[in-house]
């Protein structure tokens, strides 16, 4: 939450009029202090939210900002463990941007989180907020992330053949892919002249995600299959870099 207009009262009103099975905590950004204080802030936010809904609440962990920029991602594992121990939530969330600067650092942080969550006596699922790039989804999944949300599906146009993201106005270059969509709804939208450009692009993107995530789930069940999946997904030659940077993951 980084909007002064988004108050607890408005959050409560939204919960009251919106059917929901889960609710993310009304979180507080930029916590300060050590592991215990940062974890306590996330626990407090989740506990406060639980008073507003009967649905299970998903805590959101935020990390302290560093003076030189970025976040104290080394704190992520210990903080996530403390929050998990205190609340035992169905999901425990953390923003992708707070995992580190680059894709490899973020993946290593996710692996450290998964390692920190071992030995709890139960499996703690981890949700990564703001993650939607196909490459980061694959790498974070390999490192132990379970679910994601992001806005790439409505901000970009996907080249489904190569799993690349392009500016939204370039969707016309991939209309031939939209016409071959596996989803009958997406295929119908692509063929209907009365459907808007934006809707056609979004439906194409969602069809891509549906297919791509299905392949990712299948690949994660077998190490060799995942290596082949990731090699095809990454830029040419990048798999060598990825393996060198992520020895505990790949």
Please name every model-derived segment.
Residues 35-38, 43, 57, 61, ...:
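Extended aliphatic helical segments
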């Amino acid at each position: 939450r980084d909007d002064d207009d988004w108050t607890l009262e408005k959050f409560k009103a939204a919960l009251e009029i919106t059917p929901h099975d889960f609710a993310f905590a009304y979180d507080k950004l930029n916590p300060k202090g050590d592991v215990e204080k940062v974890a306590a802030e996330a626990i407090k936010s989740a506990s406060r939210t639980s008073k507003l809904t009967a649905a299970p609440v998903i805590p959101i962990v935020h990390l302290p900002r560093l003076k030189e920029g970025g976040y104290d991602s080394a704190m992520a594992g210990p903080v996530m463990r403390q929050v998990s121990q205190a609340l035992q939530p169905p999901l425990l969330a953390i923003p992708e941007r707070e995992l580190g600067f680059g894709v490899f650092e973020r993946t290593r942080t996710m692996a450290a989180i998964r390692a920190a969550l071992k030995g709890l006596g139960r499996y703690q699922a981890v949700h990564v907020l703001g993650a939607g790039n196909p490459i980061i989804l694959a790498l974070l999944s390999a490192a132990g992330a379970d679910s994601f949300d992001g806005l790439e599906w409505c901000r970009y146009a996907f080249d489904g053949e190569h799993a690349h993201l392009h500016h939204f106005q370039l969707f016309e270059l991939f209309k031939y892919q939209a016409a071959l969509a596996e989803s009958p709804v997406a295929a119908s939208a692509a063929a209907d002249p009365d459907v808007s450009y934006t809707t056609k692009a979004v439906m194409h993107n969602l069809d891509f995600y549906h297919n791509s995530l299905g392949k990712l789930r299948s690949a994660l069940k077998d190490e060799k299959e995942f290596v082949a999946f990731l090699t095809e997904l990454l830029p040419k030659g990048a798999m060598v870099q990825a393996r060198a940077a992520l020895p505990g993951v790949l």
